[in-house]
């Protein structure tokens, strides 16, 4: 199988072949030529005389012929090797010029790659985009695709981080055009590798760490709702319901029951309590957090009944909550248990400190360069919904800021590198985000082990997401469905088969030659299943297929920029590169305590529930 990590080199190959032919010619000159010289010279002069020419210097003619022959043969061999390697196929037979059954080709020659993609060279600033690979074994050149939205398909061990994401993060930091980044970084590797470099470049670096909250920057999920309630930072009170519904639809999971009444009631109650906490003058500012919402949500059944009775008669919220508030005690107990189980992780003292204040706001992207990293525990799903809510809230705010404050487009493009995107809970409206925010200057790169992961999470919305992707980087896949999809998408080419046959008679014989054309897939599913980092990277871009090298970060000049010096970044090296972060989240989030016997508060919570409305329709 071919590997695009090491390409044929026409000039060196030509030089090697020429050296071999020169040695052979010299051997002929010294060993065989002396004995042949007189006869050849006599015949040559005789032939020259017949044409009216003068005497011939046989030594000169032979030297000229040997030189020209050696050069021609060496050039033919080098060119044949180069064309054979870049013939447009990988594992299949040589393509035919005929197009009867298709003309799909892999574009892999260095010149063609450098015409299509931006080339980031050592010592120069990069162009913003996704680093899709390199040019052969050269550590001094990287290819950058100026993408809108992209998908990276790569299974475990495919080199997603070391050959694509880390070089891309560095390229964006080094971009000639200032850009910002929003990176989902499950294991924290990208932060360890690139954060110090980002700081030194002058970018604001933010780390939201859901796996170790003690050193995390703060993120207050209710901050947008609080801003709406207060009418600050360009927000209006009438926008608060939409902000709260982002949290409700993500943090309160759909239980997939035969009747959605329990999920609806939980989301309505959560939304109303969140609106109350965000807006009520009874709540001190330091207590406007999810811990207070969780504490209120654990109210006894009698308290919920009193709040429900304050809701307008006939309203959807009253109907939904009445089914829970006035249910038998055992039924209400199950509802309360499920609601508390959904909210307790966010009120846990190990997490609540980082959720009680905001050190970062999405609006910061409009003010200057930001490198935002989000780390979460890939081995635990306890806080995955919170990560999804963070992503949804950030994207929605970026869109709003672009529309209202920046004339429709952010002053600096924001590149979102979403690693392990498909392992997070579904982000409501993602198919809309993908299509809408690109106009605001937001570029998204989704990273998944295969297409089936995204389809299983987003189901009917998955095609809309895929249709808004203009570039796919295929690293590897063990998923048969994914391999079949790309096998069909990459098309076919025409193969020519020549058959010779000979017949013999008593006194004569004859031979015939037949030429047959047939179809061959550019990649069969089994070919794609064998493709991995040792072969290179496949880039599917606007109907064309490109193949380039997949060198790890340490083998490129991008690794030199962050101090790898040609060495792999093992655990010790990553720990050394990671910026020091102070411990700043030790005290649990402050919680407002309510005794539950204040009629005025019942009415205020009921008004908040009515004001937020029914989140099912959002």
Features from the language model and the residues they span:
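P-loop NTPase motor domains
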Residues: 141-442, 457, 526-547, 551-555, ...
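Short, solvent-exposed helix-helix connector turns and helix-capping sites enriched
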Residues: 39, 43-50, 240, 299-300, ...
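N-terminal short leaders/motifs
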Residues: 122-137, 313-330, 495-499
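Conserved ATP-driven motor cores of ASCE-family P-loop NTPases powering translocation/secretion/packaging/pilus
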Residues: 434-436, 440-538
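Basic- and hydrophobic-enriched, low-structure N-terminal and domain-boundary segments
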Residues: 1-158, 162-170, 175-177, 214, ...
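Low-complexity, polar-biased intrinsically disordered regions enriched in Pro/Ser/Thr/Gly
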Residues: 117-123, 231-235, 252-259, 283, ...
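Polar low-complexity intrinsically disordered regions enriched in Ser/Thr and small residues
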Residues: 23, 105, 126, 132, ...
